[in-house]
């Protein structure tokens, strides 16, 4: 019935088939419905041939009853080029709804066969019978007794018969939607644009675009509507001035391209509006990347004052960031050489600010063990030869060794008597199973997170604070028993700031308490 054109290549066909598989837009119709669909395409294809051919072989078939259709066809030039990759869901959903109308019209007013490409006066479907797409598609059942459902293979065979000529689809689009212009009067947008063809369909696109630039006498404005799950571009109005098309690139950007028409007086006005719309559309964010990343654009808006200011601001920001880094490096070097007291005060205040920020950050992290793993890799390396000129107390900050659990709330001091101060806190007596369980968990991970602490407290019938303190004491004893001197401790001892070998009273008390706990647990 239809002849496969060269411009409808295998890539376009495979993409159409894949889209149909994903959208299931034709699978709900039977073979008879698709046959009527192809017949409907055949009628409009004859209209297309009548309009584009120079001979008047089809002119005799149009009588006075179809003079209105003839005038509309002659008035509508092929202004819009359908893109076979992006706009396919539009015409598929629109034409499948037109099948319902084709079923009724073929039984009453048409007498065509699937093997012929010519028609009589009764074979032309009038424009009044075409309908606009709706959100509800109800397939019409024919009078045939047996109807088999469509399969993917049958669908491929039927699609291969369709003469995918872009002028034909543009003609069908206009004949279907122009007469319904009044129903979308509230949605007319002067800045919305019609679509252009992709670079894949080379031969048909070049010929159609040339005819578009020479024969165009009206401006078609489009707006997007969502019908049947697809974004449908509906024609809203037409005017005798210019055609504005939209060019799509691989980077999913959209650029407005002006096509010259007969009226050249409004060219500057449309170009000025086009540049303004581009600036508003991209929100000044992606404007600087247009001329660098996408070379397919015809116009370049990098010379716009808004874009120039944006580029200058980016350069200024880069320069200020670089200058701040250089100033920080110079300040560190000067302070290391001159031991400036003002610099030391500044670093102390900066350390305090960093300490607060790190405490707030550690609150958000749920796992204490994860915090330790992250911070252990980010510790200040005192063995670095480039940092040996710094004093050792710079590294002796709380957040550089291990992050804290957050800022502590200081409770107001209560007046206590001397007897209460002399009383020691009650010692925790752990049982043997409790000590074994705690030791096992300590071997797995020396640091507790909140979930493990709660789980251990419930299993061992202890308070969370008791479990936490036991882990703290165990870590301290393990570190003391290893006997390994920290590099930072050696530096501090060399400078005479602190002697780590001296045992303070708190350590002695902890050892005595642990030994007493072990003795009581063994007796029990």
UniProtKB/Swiss-Prot annotation:
Annotated region of DNA binding: 423-482
Single Gene Ontology MF annotation: RNA polymerase II cis-regulatory region sequence-specific DNA binding
Annotated PROSITE patterns: ENGRAILED, HOMEOBOX_1, HOMEOBOX_2
Entries under Pfam families matching the protein: Engrail_1_C_sig, Homeodomain
Region (Disordered): 194-218
DNA-binding recorded as keyword: yes
Protein's recorded name: Homeobox protein engrailed-like SMOX-2
Cross-referenced PANTHER family: HOMEOBOX PROTEIN ENGRAILED, HOMEOBOX PROTEIN INVECTED
Keywords: Developmental protein, DNA-binding, Homeobox, Nucleus
SMART domains assigned: HOX
A Gene Ontology biological process term: neuron differentiation
Annotated source species: Schistosoma mansoni
Family designation: Belongs to the engrailed homeobox family.
GO cellular component terms, A-Z: nucleus
